[in-house]
Amino acid sequence: MNFEVLYQDNNARCGVFNFNQEIIETPVFMPVGTYGAVKSISTEEIKNTGSRIILSNAFHLYFRPGLEIIKLHGNLHNFMNWSGPILTDSGGFQVFSLSRFCKVNEEGVIFQNHIDGKKTFLTPKISMKIQSDLGSNIVMIFDQCIEYNQNWEKTKNAMERSLYWAKKSRIYFDSYKNKNSLFGIIHGGIYPSLRDISLQELIKIDFDGYALGGLAVGEPKIEMYKLLDHICPQIPKNKPRYLMGVGKPEDLIEGVRRGVDMFDCVIPTRNARNGHLFVTNGVIKIRNKKYKKDLSCLDKTCVCYTCRYYSRSYLHHLDACNEILGARLNTIHNLHYYQTLMSNIRNSIKNNTFEQFSLNFYKQKNKIDF
């Protein structure tokens, strides 16, 4: 993977990834396909929304269907019929959030897995092997995630352990001699000084990109933005910056404003399944009875499949009947909205009009309360 910044408007950056002839423009939003599928839609439909790179979770795929099944197909790309790049999360967050039993030591984590309840030992070495077998284009290091609002000492200990695992991840990743990329993850909670230490040590190890972990986990938005203001300028300018698990449309705007290049989040797909649909002026809650006889499309500025062929009234009906088609059409629309937003952001950076674009975004967003 090669990465190059081509345009800059203040701190906002526009660049390209080159994955063996597959060109991905940044800033980029990655739909989440945790189990090798973006919920309710096919890979062809994912492409048609404008999505070019997706995220899957190595932790979940390791347990179900398991590496043996995926390797029968060659790799994760073949298994799910996706020709574009795939970034895999190492599973650090899932180990700590899903497990009923979890014991951490310097070598890894012993936990009770959520599929059959068996004790499992996950280490940086195993995580790198899993992601290598999956054929991930971007591999994330194995890290220790902790809850927001932990004290300085606990946060420091977790950050130092993540650094130790980062070194191990680098060694084991390199041993596979593949041409994929490895990203480090900056930790340190809400403490800027710990974030500084984490980043500087990761830079010494030398990764292909740097992710900001442990954010959007309950902290006030202003705290997240302050940390981005603090840490992004310190990340090497020639390396991509990835804000993990974020976010809402306004988070994408504010992340890009601070120099972030990559995002992922379940919000567009999860909200779609719950009838919350993003449009130019805000969010339509399609379950509201006022849409029962509304013959207009979701958003007259949108050219997605859903907006071209279906009315709000029909989408309201599908939701009321709990029809699977409703989740599919809603997901297509929300992902198309996100990818259109990212495309417009990139164009504004190229034209040095990002600030004006963001002002217009907020003006339109707050114009109507749906």
UniProtKB/Swiss-Prot annotation:
What keywords appear on the UniProt entry? Glycosyltransferase, Metal-binding, Queuosine biosynthesis, Transferase, tRNA processing, Zinc
Q: Name one GO biological process term.
A: tRNA-guanine transglycosylation
Please list the residues that bind substrate.
89-93, 143, 214
Question: GO CC terms for this protein?
Answer: cytosol
Pathway info:
tRNA modification; tRNA-queuosine biosynthesis
- Which cofactor is recorded for it? Zn(2+)
Quote the EC number.
Answer: 2.4.2.29
- Binding positions (Zn(2+)): 302, 304, 307, 333
Q: State the signal peptide span.
A: none
Q: Which SUPFAM superfamilies match?
A: tRNA-guanine transglycosylase (SSF51713)
Co-factor binding details: Binds 1 zinc ion per subunit.
Region entry RNA binding, spans = 245-251, 269-273
What is the designated name of this protein? Queuine tRNA-ribosyltransferase
Native organism is Buchnera aphidicola subsp. Acyrthosiphon pisum (strain 5A)
Gene expressing this chain: tgt
